[in-house]
């Protein structure tokens, strides 16, 4: 998926960059794979899967930098526009 053509995913692109920079390459790779390698039927399906990965990361790694916390929250705000009950 080309982020230039899909500006709605820039938050997730930045999250991937920051996750890698803070040593969370495994979850960054999972998000990158979902965003760029999987052919999704709908954008809402993609957002749901990205949201589940983010929630899993937040559960397993509760302490991160303030910048990463803000990016995680921003990305989840986008996910919750489509999946308001995601937990």
Located regions from the model:
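C-terminal-biased regions
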Residues: 1-87
């Amino acid at each position: 998926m080309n982020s230039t053509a899909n500006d709605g995913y820039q938050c997730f692109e930045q999250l991937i960059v920051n996750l890698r920079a803070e040593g969370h390459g495994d979850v960054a790779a999972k998000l990158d794979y979902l965003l760029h390698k999987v052919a999704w039927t709908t954008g809402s399906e993609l957002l749901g899967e990205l949201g589940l990965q983010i929630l899993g990361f937040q559960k397993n790694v509760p302490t991160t930098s303030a910048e990463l916390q803000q990016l995680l929250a921003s990305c989840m705000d986008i996910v919750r526009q489509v999946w308001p009950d995601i937990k």
